[in-house]
Regions:
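PLP-dependent enzyme catalytic core of the Aspartate aminotransferase-like
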Residues: 104-150
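Short, well-ordered loop/turn and helix-capping segments at boundaries between secondary-structure elements
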Residues: 12-13, 50-54, 82, 145, ...
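A structural signal for short secondary-structure junctions
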Residues: 2, 39, 91-94, 120
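Conserved PLP-binding catalytic core of the aspartate aminotransferase-like
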Residues: 57-115
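Active-site PLP attachment segment
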Residues: 1-21
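Active-site-proximal structural scaffolding
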Residues: 2-4, 19, 38, 69, ...
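Structural signature of PLP-dependent enzymes
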Residues: 23-42, 48-77
Length: 150
């Protein structure tokens, strides 16, 4: 589903008068972002949720993925905090998403790309799900070296 760009948006509105304004803004964002949502992810989700066995299998797989991402976040935190930076990188243990902004600027991201073959958007958003036990030390060392040049 990740590659299919499935998503969900929920907005709680306490004042009825604000509802049309919010709907208008959301429609504007939708129009500039993707215009028409893909139908394939919705069909996948429908199939998964209608079948108890598929739903259970999916939930088990999600639990495994969440645990692995949490483990990699913690490993990233431990590695980056080795030199007394615990407070600076504490957010890594507090977050749970696939991506995290790690505080690099565009110049530092370019250094990582050129010197270490580590790719991420210029805003410093790292894909934690792309980390594993084989590359975490390499990534941590490169990030620390890049941060030292700040």
């Amino acid at each position: 589903l990740y590659g299919e760009r499935a998503g969900f948006l929920a907005i709680v509105i306490h004042e009825k008068e604000s509802m049309q304004k919010v709907i208008s803004q959301v429609r504007s964002l939708i129009r500039t972002t993707y215009s028409n949502p893909p139908i394939h992810p919705a069909r996948i989700v429908k199939t998964l949720l209608k079948s108890p066995s598929l739903k259970q299998e999916w939930l088990e797989e999600l639990a495994i993925i969440r645990a692995r991402i949490k483990e990699m976040r913690h490993a990233l935190f431990v590695g980056l905090s080795a030199n007394g930076n615990e407070r600076r990188f504490a957010f890594l243990n507090e977050q749970s998403a696939i991506f995290s902004f790690i505080g690099l600027d565009a110049r530092q991201v370019e250094i990582l790309r050129q010197e270490n073959g580590i790719y991420m958007p210029a805003n410093g958003r790292i894909n934690v799900a792309g980390l594993n036990t084989h590359n975490i030390n390499y990534v941590v060392e490169a990030l620390l070296a890049c941060n030292i040049r700040k």
